């Protein structure tokens, strides 16, 4: 009471203060202005961008890790608590699917240990999350759903027997059978069911029931004329909660393995493994690229009951996976048995090329020649690059991986197609890392790079910008954790395709490294962002459209001449420099064709941009990129691709069965541009123009210099 009054502490103001960033909010446009670079992809108005998807030829089997429980505040770890959390994710913005310009919110855990598998449907795609791993960070998960058509039926409409009526917006909806455009395609079923779990992963998880107390899966060949007929019996195990599933006895014929498009029709937040077993929904982005050669085996299948929701694209996360393993390599990506060229000479900042192998390793790489491949298995074959020659000093990735998976006595060779229950041979994390080390360069990029700033998060890892110490130049660094990849082998796409193909209109990759258990890809940083920003916020005139098309066609002509199919051409995959130059990116989805493997069948791409033959599961080649470019032209004209207001399944059905799409306002488009579009959007692939032919079209004479794109970037940033 009589004590001295304490002196008030004075805090000085900041010294050397600089106001570098001013962030505001425009009430008229309802948008933030002046955001820092790393905030753009979090708050950008790109929540409606669809995500790409892939054909699940064979999801890499993975080693199980203990499943995690979730504790959120005072909530108990019940199944309902996980499903309740999903309501919160609907309000989180999801950015476009471009892997170099993407952010996504952190992923939640997967739920209680009593669950076997969770799957959700996001943007019409049912995705599965089977296991938890040691880390809480995001991981890539390829929602691959289809197998080679010769194995599982002649069309996409035989995946399941119809068992559930479709619901849309809370009302039951019956769809009429439509006549398919292709004679090979039958009418679509009216009922909707979920996608099957991958055969190998599903069986592997259920056979390990002794560890987790879930289900015991007794399976044997059914007595049937078809070699692909199986009889499955679910029997109860220790977990009482799953005993209700024991009543189900599932017998699948060859037609049951045929994929169905109906699984894409809805976007519910969660779906169920069985009619009585709710599962947590995990949102993840699917990734293209069909990976290594898989065994000729069907997928396991179970009908899934789903709850339809609205059509808005919601946030998604990635499942945490423990160490995945992989099958014998195939020629679906890179060039099967690629010949690695020595480092390029010149003044490149980053030396390119792999390290030379020791003599013993070089010989080991070709030790798999005596292995007997199963029937129908495509043995890796060399794609003859005009500028590359075979050298015994450099070993091929596919050959090396094959030797790893076959020579080890721990992993006996597979006997797929026989009556045995033997699993595909596996490659450990250490073996895979050793194989990847042959492709990347030695050293640590942190020795010459600093100031790493995260600017995005893609389907396989995060993207940072970094500064070169000795020049001050900014580069993009894509960091991918090997242990958190659902399909580790797809990482070779990112490294080898970008390393071997250099063009003025292709994003340049400087180098790649293994830093611990992460693959770091150092590449060109394009300050202008993605074409998606321009398409969604501004309107392009025909000069600007022609300028973009000219650059993209030059890149495609170069890639197609090398036998590379991009398979995901869209505005998200087109990046711009600050001065308006246009470059093609995202090569994780590509495939290689050659004389030995002239066509592809995998369902790969983003639904609205897919060519009809891809959706129809017909063999396809480089022509699919031309169709996708035509859709991207419509995107530049109308601001979005055709059928963008429809769910992916309905859009895919219309692409497959209807006449080619057209722009909304034809009267606003010149006859020259209409003619240009008509050459690309041709249903018959053989009648579709090639990239080289399109480069001579009169419309491209309207193309201006790269500087004509700069005002669009300024206009977008002003918004």
Swiss-Prot record:
Polar residues: bias regions: 226-244, 357-372
Binding site for ATP: 455-463, 478
Disruption phenotype: Mice are viable and fertile, and show normal development of brain, eye, pancreas and adrenal gland.
Note on domains (UniProt): An autoinhibitory domain is present in the N-terminal region of the protein.
Residue ranges of every copy of the CRIB domain listed in the record: 11-24
Record's subunit section: Interacts tightly with GTP-bound but not GDP-bound CDC42/p21 and RAC1. Interacts with MARK2, leading to inhibit MARK2 independently of kinase activity. Interacts with RHOD and RHOH.
GO MF assignments: ATP binding; protein serine kinase activity; protein serine/threonine kinase activity
Cellular location(s): Mitochondrion; Cytoplasm; Nucleus
Coiled-coil stretches noted in the UniProt entry, renumbered to this chain: none
Top-rank lineage group of the source organism: Eukaryota
Protein name from the UniProt record: Serine/threonine-protein kinase PAK 5
UniProt xrefs under InterPro entries: CRIB_dom, CRIB_dom_sf, Kinase-like_dom_sf, PAK3-like, PAK_BD, Prot_kinase_dom, Protein_kinase_ATP_BS, STKc_PAK5
GO cellular component, one term: nuclear membrane
Positions carrying Phosphothreonine: 107
Species per Swiss-Prot/TrEMBL record: Mus musculus
PTM statement from Swiss-Prot or TrEMBL: Autophosphorylated when activated by CDC42/p21.
Modified residues (Phosphoserine): 104
PROSITE patterns: CRIB (PS50108), PROTEIN_KINASE_ATP (PS00107), PROTEIN_KINASE_DOM (PS50011)
Stretches assigned to the Protein kinase domain: 449-700
Family, similarity comment: Belongs to the protein kinase superfamily. STE Ser/Thr protein kinase family. STE20 subfamily.
Catalytic reaction list: L-seryl-[protein] + ATP = O-phospho-L-seryl-[protein] + ADP + H(+); L-threonyl-[protein] + ATP = O-phospho-L-threonyl-[protein] + ADP + H(+)
Enzyme Commission code: 2.7.11.1
SUPFAM superfamilies for the chain: Protein kinase-like (PK-like) (SSF56112)
Keywords: Apoptosis, ATP-binding, Cytoplasm, Kinase, Mitochondrion, Nucleotide-binding, Nucleus, Phosphoprotein, Serine/threonine-protein kinase, Transferase
Function: Serine/threonine protein kinase that plays a role in a variety of different signaling pathways including cytoskeleton regulation, cell migration, proliferation or cell survival. Activation by various effectors including growth factor receptors or active CDC42 and RAC1 results in a conformational change and a subsequent autophosphorylation on several serine and/or threonine residues. Phosphorylates the proto-oncogene RAF1 and stimulates its kinase activity. Promotes cell survival by phosphorylating the BCL2 antagonist of cell death BAD.
GO biological process: apoptotic process; cytoskeleton organization; learning; locomotory behavior; memory; negative regulation of extrinsic apoptotic signaling pathway
Region span, Disordered: 1-28, 96-118, 226-245, 253-298, 339-372
């Amino acid at each position: 009471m009589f004590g001295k009054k304490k002196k008030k502490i004075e805090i000085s103001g900041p010294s050397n203060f600089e106001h570098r960033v001013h962030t505001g909010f425009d009430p008229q446009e309802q948008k933030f202005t002046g955001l820092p670079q790393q905030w753009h992809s979090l708050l950008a108005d790109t929540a409606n961008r669809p995500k790409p998807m892939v054909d699940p030829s064979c999801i890499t089997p993975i080693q199980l890790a203990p499943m995690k429980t979730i504790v959120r505040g005072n909530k108990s770890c019940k199944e309902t608590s996980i499903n309740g959390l999903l309501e919160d994710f609907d309000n989180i913005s999801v950015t476009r699917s471009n892997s170099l310009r993407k952010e996504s919110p952190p992923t939640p855990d997967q739920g209680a240990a009593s669950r076997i598998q969770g799957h959700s449907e996001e943007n019409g795609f049912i995705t599965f999350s089977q296991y938890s791993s040691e880390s809480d960070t995001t991981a890539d998960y390829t929602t691959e759903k289809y197998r080679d058509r010769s194995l599982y039926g002649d069309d996409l409409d035989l995946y399941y027997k119809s068992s559930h009526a479709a619901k849309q917006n809370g009302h039951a909806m019956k769809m009429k059978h439509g006549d398919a455009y292709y004679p090979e395609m039958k009418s679509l079923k009216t009922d909707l069911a979920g996608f099957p779990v991958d055969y190998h992963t599903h069986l592997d998880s259920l056979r390990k029931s002794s560890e987790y107390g879930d289900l015991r899966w007794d399976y044997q060949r059914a007595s049937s004329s078809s070699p692909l007929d199986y009889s499955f019996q679910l029997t109860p195990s220790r977990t009482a909660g799953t005993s209700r599933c024991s009543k189900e006895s599932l017998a699948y014929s060859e037609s049951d393995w045929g994929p169905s498009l109906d699984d894409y029709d809805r976007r519910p937040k969660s779906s169920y493994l069985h009619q009585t077993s709710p599962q947590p929904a995990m949102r993840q982005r699917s990734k293209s690229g069909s990976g290594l050669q898989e065994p000729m085996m069907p997928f396991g299948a179970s009908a899934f009951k789903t709850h339809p929701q609205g059509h808005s694209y919601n946030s998604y996360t990635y499942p945490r996976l423990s160490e995945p393993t992989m099958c014998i390599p195939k020629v679906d990506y890179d060039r099967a048995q690629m010949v690695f060229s020595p480092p390029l000479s010149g003044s490149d900042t980053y030396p390119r090329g792999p390290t030379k192998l020791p003599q013993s390793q070089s010989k080991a790489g070709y030790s798999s020649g005596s292995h007997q491949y199963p029937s129908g298995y495509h043995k890796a074959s060399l794609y003859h690059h005009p500028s590359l020659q075979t050298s015994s000093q450099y070993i091929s990735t596919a050959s090396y991986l094959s030797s790893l998976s076959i020579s080890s006595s721990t992993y006996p060779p597979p006997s797929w197609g026989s009556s045995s229950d033997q699993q595909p041979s596996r490659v450990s994390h250490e073996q895979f890392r050793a194989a990847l080390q042959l492709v990347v360069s030695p050293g640590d990029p942190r020795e010459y790079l600093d100031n790493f700033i995260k600017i995005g998060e893609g389907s396989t890892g995060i993207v940072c910008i970094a500064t070169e110490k000795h020049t001050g130049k900014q580069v993009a660094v894509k960091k991918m954790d090997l242990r958190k990849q659902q399909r580790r082998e797809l990482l070779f796409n990112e490294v080898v395709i970008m390393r071997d193909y250099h063009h003025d209109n292709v994003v340049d990759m400087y180098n790649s490294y293994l830093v611990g258990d992460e693959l770091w890809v150092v590449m060109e940083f394009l300050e202008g962002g993605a074409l998606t920003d321009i398409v969604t916020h501004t309107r392009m005139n025909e000069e600007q459209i022609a300028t973009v098309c000219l650059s993209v066609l030059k890149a495609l002509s170069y890639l197609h001449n090398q036998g590379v199919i991009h398979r995901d051409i869209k505005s998200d995959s087109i990046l711009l420099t600050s001065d308006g130059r246009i470059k093609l990116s995202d090569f994780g989805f590509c495939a290689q064709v050659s004389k030995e493997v002239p066509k592809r069948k995998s369902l790969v791409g983003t639904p609205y941009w897919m060519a009809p033959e891809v959706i129809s599961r017909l063999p396809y080649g480089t022509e699919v990129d031309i169709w996708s470019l035509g859709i991207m032209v419509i995107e530049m004209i109308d601001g979005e691709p055709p059928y963008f207001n429809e769910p992916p399944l309905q859009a895919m059905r219309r692409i497959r069965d209807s006449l080619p799409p057209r722009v909304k306002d034809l009267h606003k488009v010149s006859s020259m541009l209409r003619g240009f579009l008509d050459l690309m959007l041709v249903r018959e692939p053989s009648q579709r123009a090639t990239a080289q032919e399109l480069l001579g079209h009169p419309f491209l004479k309207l193309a201006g210099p790269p500087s004509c794109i700069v005002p669009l970037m300024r206009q977008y940033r002003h918004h």
